[in-house]
Amino acid sequence: ETCQDVEDETDEMKIIPLFPSTLHAYTVKDFDKEGLLDYIYAEYDFDPEGRTISNRGGWQSSVDYTAEDNPLLDVVERTLRHDFFFRTLKHEDFHIEDLWININRPGAFNHKHNHPGSVFSGVFWINAPKDSGLLVFDNPNAFTMWDEMNSYSDEFQKILPVHPAYYMTPKEGMIVIFPSSIYHKVDLNESVENRISIS
């Protein structure tokens, strides 16, 4: 429990977000994009069927890449241990429970879903061409806050994002971590290239 007094030292309006959902974004520096892509396409050639969960029109690996050392686990774990586990969490015993590959071909997308049984989920974009599909997060309070959100001016909504959904453009080399309970989807890949990520 936290109690925080609002100091009234100025006449300016104060905005205090109550109970926000947090999204963490990290840039992976100097990652071997071509090496990772070679590894990913070799995995695809080994198991071209993959599995279907939320993906439509694309390929998702059926292998658990946390079971043994591999370049995918190495780059994600190295980044998260330094930037997320140690600097953000109070417990150091968090670990990556599952890791899979996503190849969203042109025209592919992912239905809205979340990840029960996990605390945090995330995505690392390895190849993210322009127009390859936004990552869309649904506001879990969109129904109960609908009238409140529609009452705010456009200017205020820009200051403090209070929208029914949050849209994020994928960026190569970025890892995004978010609460597993939040429903999210991937929009249609409207580019002519594969959008490739690991989650």
Task: Describe the function of each predicted region.
Residues 89-99:
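A short coil-to-beta-strand element that immediately follows conserved catalytic motifs
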Residues 122-123, 193-199:
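A short hydrophobic beta-strand segment most commonly corresponding to one strand
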Residues 184, 189, 194-196:
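Extracellular and organelle-lumenal recognition/adhesion modules and their flexible linkers in secreted
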